[in-house]
Amino acid sequence: MTPVRQTVKFDKKLLDKDAVKVVQSLIKAGYDAYLVGGCIRDLLLGYEPKDFDIATNATPEQVHKTFKRSRIIGRRFRLVHIMFSARKFIEVATFRAGMVKTSNSGVVVRDNFYGSLQDDVFRRDFTVNALYYDVVSSQVIDYVGGLDDLKAAEIKMIGNPKERFEEDPVRMIRAVRFKVKLSALLEPGLSNSISTNAHLLANIPPARLYEEVIKLFHNDNSIEVFNELLNFGLLKHLFSQTKESLFIKAALENTSKRIKSGNSVTPAFIFAVFLWSAFNLRVVVTTKKNKPRVDTMINAAEFVIKNQTQQVMMPRWLSTRVKDIWLMQYQLENCNPKKERDLISNPRFRMAYDFLV
């Protein structure tokens, strides 16, 4: 198959200099290397990419040998992280081949079979994410019509949607995220397949789904994301204890406003919002007198959080903060004037106050 090679223009100031250096170093060492995926998609749309990924024909061991400050990570997908500081690294992946190892349910459990650039294209999820940028020629290499789909604002799956979702059900979540982020349409076959295969999310480890949930809701269009998850039947496989409510939508609106204003949003706020109704219900069910005791509320919180972690992992620090937010609601609603100063000085006060209002 002959790809389209198209010279493209975008603001070169948005290119990460370290990522370009990595590509140039790999080329100098005799390998092929390209910037690939979401960073190219975002650059062509005029967005500043959050991450820059690189694909190469060098094996992880060869990449590691080329860069002193690097490490090989992963079992399911072996990657190389090239370190530039304590907080910054550039991720390099070797071209994947079409052959993969799957579980009985069809989920890819190992994808460390290496191939060519063309092989790698057809291991990617959507056409708009299968664009490779050659830093030498300033051309984008496109095997699957991704450039045209990007212009048309349409998300298309590479390959059969059902088979690709069976390989990796997280692709359904990614499809929703890109649909909202790019204000795009999903091709009909892709859209229908998400609704049909939503149950496959149960095959994904809760720890991996946690990372995807953070990506879904830490943006300025979280209400649209929530609605799409509901429409496709995905929400119940992420937050089975969560129901649609005006409270949730108001909280997500607050989240969007904070992000648009350049303020940060903690995952604890999102999880506390989504699980608040389930927590409240558990408190009511287990309260023996009119006013719930602190231990009753703690037990209710732990019950709800334990159920949630069966679907999406909540790290210990996150579950602790969520409990703090919930318990502080009762303190805020029944605040003794003598204890106001102590309450306001609590490090969780701002999150709890935003939650209350």
Task: List each language-model region with its residue ranges.
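Catalytic cores of the polymerase beta-like nucleotidyltransferase superfamily
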Residues: 1-357
